[in-house]
Swiss-Prot record:
<protein>
    <recommendedName>
        <fullName>17 kDa surface antigen</fullName>
    </recommendedName>
</protein>
<dbReference type="GO" id="GO:0009279">
    <property type="term" value="C:cell outer membrane"/>
</dbReference>
<comment type="similarity">
    <text>Belongs to the rickettsiale 17 kDa surface antigen family.</text>
</comment>
<dbReference type="InterPro" id="IPR016364">
    <property type="entry name" value="Surface_antigen_Rickettsia"/>
</dbReference>
<dbReference type="Pfam" id="PF05433">
    <property type="entry name" value="Rick_17kDa_Anti"/>
</dbReference>
<dbReference type="InterPro" id="IPR008816">
    <property type="entry name" value="Gly_zipper_2TM_dom"/>
</dbReference>
<keyword id="KW-0732">Signal</keyword>
<dbReference type="InterPro" id="IPR032635">
    <property type="entry name" value="Anti_2"/>
</dbReference>
<keyword id="KW-0998">Cell outer membrane</keyword>
<dbReference type="Pfam" id="PF16998">
    <property type="entry name" value="17kDa_Anti_2"/>
</dbReference>
<feature type="lipid moiety-binding region" description="S-diacylglycerol cysteine">
    <location>
        <position position="20"/>
    </location>
</feature>
<feature type="lipid moiety-binding region" description="N-palmitoyl cysteine">
    <location>
        <position position="20"/>
    </location>
</feature>
<keyword id="KW-0564">Palmitate</keyword>
<keyword id="KW-0449">Lipoprotein</keyword>
<feature type="signal peptide">
    <location>
        <begin position="1"/>
        <end position="19"/>
    </location>
</feature>
<keyword id="KW-0472">Membrane</keyword>
Amino acid sequence: MKLLSKIMIIALAASMLQACNSPGGMNKQGTGTLLGGAGGALLGSQFGKGKGQLVGVGVGALLGAVLGGQIGAGMDEQDRRLAELTSQRALETAPSGSNVEWRNPDNGNYGYVTPNKTYRNSNGQYCREYTQTVVIGGKQQKAYGNACRQPDGQ
């Protein structure tokens, strides 16, 4: 839990720095980099103990930030909203291996979420592996992740 708090503090600090650095606040690429880095750090924190866990956090944050920045650079607010809603729907209701697609008619960007294996983690939470694919400006990017249901049901 202490590690998660440190990650969130770092993410918040990076967010404030990015917002101050960009005219008009945080841009799409900065948001993608920040969210990707925080998500990667959180995912990396699930592996190893002690120094091994710190390595996992560092590697996860770096890879997440790079991928998030690339994706975020081309996604607008509507793209992000469509992707988020589709992810929630796919993870809640779609059978494993099926694609649930979103498409932004205003710019032609699209993507899909493919839920995979459902399992219970060591804390007893129900989790699901998934693949998220986005096509922004004709370029495809893929990301892999795990989502776990929280105690409040979300």
